[in-house]
């Protein structure tokens, strides 16, 4: 079966956001590549973009959360649009609460975590970096 690895574009704060995500999920980055690491005649990198993230990966369970900073030359990511929504299926109600509370810190809750009409324990929020998340736990699954 295919594995889905969400990828998020950032406006220069990918490293900060991923450090925050790592503080909630734990683990270690498997790969961090900066734009300056790829600089060369065929790929010139402006000085202001040298330390931006070209690629970062954080293993979570059997998947990877991937991200990068968008170089200034490509324009800004519209952070008010729904760039993505990441769904997390928790293994327990306690894990769902931990992830929901940890990731939503400093963000805005759109749907407080709790028992949903469809039978799962569910919550939805936008984190302090503008990324939308859904957390659910399905009892008996």
Which residue ranges define each predicted feature?
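Short, small/polar residue-rich loop motifs at catalytic or cofactor-binding pockets
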Residues: 52, 117-120
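Glyoxalase I/VOC metalloenzyme domain signal
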Residues: 1-111, 124-141
